[in-house]
């Protein structure tokens, strides 16, 4: 027998704990392998379907980069797997897939499931994003280079609109 009942729609994610992320942000990010912090500006919205939180960002040119670097992060909730999923793509073919069990207090921890093999990155540790207020947040992560050296990456972000 052929079924004619339409498949039910997946439940929309509950973005309530992440709504403070909507809007424009400026972040100063310091990597222990770079001489100075770099600046990223971004805008976060909810897509028209309500299933994705989308962040479009620009890492601005520095003395060690040739040009601005643009990227897109798309976050949703996988109700079947009971986890948040973040898919990132960027200039020069970069990509990343991270998952998280969700917010615990004022922090969310993202674990990389798949990373693009670029920039001498061999492995990563989870990234912790911490909400300081509705207009300030920070993040911390580390990664291992092929040489074995561990590199720390810390960001301080503030809302600009």
Residue ranges of predicted features:
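Hydrophobic small-molecule pocket/channel-lining residues, especially in calycin-type beta-barrels
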Residues: 1-161
């Amino acid at each position: 027998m052929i079924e004619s009942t339409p498949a039910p729609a997946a439940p929309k994610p509950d973005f309530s704990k992440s709504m403070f992320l909507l809007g424009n942000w400026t972040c100063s990010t310091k990597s222990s392998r770079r001489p100075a912090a770099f600046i990223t500006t971004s805008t976060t919205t909810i897509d028209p379907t309500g299933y994705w939180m989308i962040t479009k960002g620009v890492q601005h040119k520095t003395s060690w980069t040739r040009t601005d670097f643009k990227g897109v992060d798309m976050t949703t909730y996988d109700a079947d797997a009971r986890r948040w999923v973040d898919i990132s793509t960027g200039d020069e073919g970069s990509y990343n897939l991270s998952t998280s069990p969700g917010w615990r207090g004022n922090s969310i921890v993202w674990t990389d499931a798949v990373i693009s093999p670029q920039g001498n990155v061999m492995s990563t540790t989870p990234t912790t994003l911490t909400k300081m207020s509705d207009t300030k947040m920070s993040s911390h992560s580390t990664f291992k280079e092929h040489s074995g050296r561990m590199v720390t990456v810390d960001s301080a972000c503030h809302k600009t609109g």
